[in-house]
């Protein structure tokens, strides 16, 4: 049985920043994550994706962001329990006992759920025989954009992932078609502005009012993508790569059985300190929901700070927290975190 102050479920960017915040407040942390490495979707799904809304970084790729967050958290010696899920919760007086899928037992006064989308997988387009092309010509995630150099690429979707990858790949691809069923994109306005600017150079062709209809190719090698509009008119796009970005399937797994208020795969929290309906359990980042919620990494960072400051008195048996700025605190010697 491990004993700690805080258990953080999820080792994505928000979970890692929560480790740092807890450490700054003198709290010990154990971190549970279902993946084999820390970083969440930033590492597993899109390590080379550029991120534009992190303060002080005009642009930073996801992998580098995780590297910096892990470095920031390292002085506080977090213990990582990777490749395992939190499956059982037992409340005992003023503490919790958590059991993982590897039978790891952890006793903690506070739980911070920073599980992002929970267990995740791509929403796949309903195209005949698409599985024949997967991993060779059809990709749902990008972990090495260099493999797309000189290719003719169809990107499908209208959100941030579709627009950001169209922009990012436009400087190495031969041609990009961005297919979206509407004329309006839901990505960040500045990203849409950049997209339309690049489209004027013909590096990106916007195919709006169309949806994916069929794939054509041989031996797992794509030759063209057929798209169709609302009047059933079709168009053939010569392409050897398809990147469908239609979001992720969300699955809270065992968290859904913990007695938390769950709505549409999200955990309801109060908007002051992000505490759930169970005292001592908080939810932050994309998994948390409240009125006015913004799904930004930056928002998750702020939620981590607020929730852990609120949890201080629970961890330290009612002791009042005397707020200090980080410039007055000593983070101690840097040391390596521990993975279990």
UniProtKB/Swiss-Prot annotation:
Transmembrane segments: none annotated. It is an enzyme of class 1 (oxidoreductase). InterPro entries: FAD/NAD-bd_sf, FAD/NAD-binding_dom, Fd--NADP_Rdtase_type_2, Ferredoxin-NADP_redctase_2. Binds 1 FAD per subunit. FAD binds at residues 33, 41, 46, 86, 120, 286, 327. It catalyses: 2 reduced [2Fe-2S]-[ferredoxin] + NADP(+) + H(+) = 2 oxidized [2Fe-2S]-[ferredoxin] + NADPH. The keyword Chaperone does not apply. Its EC number is 1.18.1.2. Its cofactor is FAD. One of its GO terms (molecular function) is flavin adenine dinucleotide binding. The keyword Oxidoreductase applies. Belongs to the ferredoxin--NADP reductase type 2 family. Homodimer. HAMAP family: FENR2. This is Ferredoxin--NADP reductase. It comes from Rickettsia rickettsii (strain Iowa).
